[in-house]
Amino acid sequence: MEIQFLGTGAGVPAKHRNVTGIALKLLDERNAVWLFDCGEGTQLQILKSSIRPRKIEKIFITHLHGDHIFGLPGLLSSRSFQGGTEPLEIYGPVGIADFVKTSLRVSQSRLSYPLKFIELTKENDVIFKDKQFTVRCNILDHGITSFGYRIEEAAHEGELQVEKLQALGIPSGPLYGKLKRGETIVFDGQEINGQAFVGERKPGRIVTILGDTRKTKNSVTLARRADVLVHESTFNKHEAKMAKAYFHSTSQQAAEVAKEAQVKQLILTHISARYLTKEAYQLQEEAQEIFPNTKIVKDMDIIEIPFANEGGA
């Protein structure tokens, strides 16, 4: 599991930062990619990455401002043009279906795959769940309807302790599969309980990706004990009044959310073009005053999300 940042800028594309596009790469987990927001130029950024559009299984839109959705019609059309046939689901605020359907209709674009819309209307709602993942959403504070998303991975079964089995002379093969499932087998007249040879279950990972927002209690709820929190940082710590007026957050407000939620790592994105490279890293330093494990990302950065016992992100 890893996150690739296709665009880390705010408002409009800039020379060094495209507008928002975040890919949660679940290739090992389900051979799929989930995309969070799709600002103008996102598909060009995808071309610079290893992501294949046909692998995009779900798209989660945080809100309907242009810097988060203007790249969507083009990406959907290109996915079809490139031979994509796998179904695609789009989650987002009420209006996302109308935006996409109107864009496709006016441009006379036809898709080669089924497209399903799930428009969100409830706070603190489970919007997707299967054996692997649960996705929750909650409303943020951005003037227009804006959502944050919490992706919870189910626990992983413990590893089979092969060395212990080999010490008993049990050969690899079908018996290992039964033992891995916790079944009891008979080997050389002795009962072997598989549960005694399977390690502890690994807790699933949690990723929280927030849309544009002021600091709000819902942000803390969504981020509670997450392995990674992706939070906007549109303004520096000296511009709190401006952040409030424009329904955005400062670097230190993002850090306060991370600290209150007890997350493991804070990722800052949605960086204004007013902050060049040096000034942008000052945002990181400001946040680190409150939450040390903070990183500001640039376009195309990849953040790996290991299991808890494999070290920090």
From Swiss-Prot:
Keywords: Endonuclease, Hydrolase, Metal-binding, Nuclease, tRNA processing, Zinc. The keyword Chaperone does not apply. GO terms for molecular function: 3'-tRNA processing endoribonuclease activity; zinc ion binding. Zn(2+) 1 binds at H63, H65, H142, D212. Binds 2 Zn(2+) ions. Its EC number is 3.1.26.11. The active site is at D67. It catalyses: Endonucleolytic cleavage of RNA, removing extra 3' nucleotides from tRNA precursor, generating 3' termini of tRNAs. A 3'-hydroxy group is left at the tRNA terminus and a 5'-phosphoryl group is left at the trailer molecule. Zn(2+) 2 binds at D67, H68, D212, H270. The keyword Metal-binding applies. Its cofactor is Zn(2+). Zinc phosphodiesterase, which displays some tRNA 3'-processing endonuclease activity. Probably involved in tRNA maturation, by removing a 3'-trailer from precursor tRNA. Homodimer. NCBIfam families: PRK00055.1-3, RNase_Z. Belongs to the RNase Z family. HAMAP family: RNase_Z_BN. This is Ribonuclease Z. It comes from Enterococcus faecalis (strain ATCC 700802 / V583). The gene is rnz.
